Amino acid sequence: MRRADHAVIAVGREAKAMLGRTPGNILAVRPLKDGVIADVEVTEKMLGYFIKNLQGARALFRPRVVIGVPSSITQVERRAVRDSVMHAGARTVYLIHAPVAAALGAGLPIQEPGGNVIVDIGGGTTEVAVISLAGVVYCNAVRGAGDAMDEKIVEHLRKHHNLLIGELRAEEVKIALASAWPVGERRTMEVNGRDLGAGLPKTVTITDEEIREALGESVTRIIETIRTCLEQTLPELAADIVDKGIVLTGGGALLRGLDLRLHHETQLPVRVADDPLVCGALGVGKILEEIDLWKKVATPI
């Protein structure tokens, strides 16, 4: 967005590509952080942009909006989400727990009386939830998700290679090299950045093994969160989980070897959902399409 008048220039992937590359008169902003609103004004502008694209020539059209939110957010944060969406032009706002949306998008039978464990690893938070009868029986969240992993990669390169890189480059390293368990052949990658000593451009070669070690703390936090959730699960639901196992969704589910590591740590079946990146969006879409499901899992505020 432009600093002078706060006009929106780009949204989404196009805006993300500008991170760390904007001139002084343009500001790249993340409206949401750790699953909640970080900047109310910018959030409303972003939502208004989306709704305007939906409206097209129908200027009076005001959509019904369903939004997935972390199960751990407070009532104040829930109202902040509602207010921002209403100000952006929505007719009605319904909130749904993000793990429920992800479970629906992954095709889990959450309306049945049986335990389903979903581990939704997003950008800001990882949520582990036990879901039954279309509701969250138990949920635990931790800030050990994709953004935190990017930060760990930046920190590792700064400490061990005296190299400063941006968050986009860190994400590229994560996608290319990161893993939670040794898989396949040893991989290396050349990374460009700025030498913290000389202040000049510099290139270093890094390995998948050192990135796996750099992300060790983040992966361990996810494992501990899953264990806590399983320990709090009712015995009847625990029996279901032994058979059904754990389903991974969100971008973090694509971390190489994460399913193998979690199986090793929990001794439960673990699988990555089909299209884990979009499970949350697919689940919200199902709620909008199926009125009976919408009434069960989405709550107006």
Regions found by a protein language model. Give the residues of each.
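Nucleotide/phosphate-binding catalytic cleft detector across ATP-hydrolyzing
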Residues: M1-I121, A129-V247, A253-I301
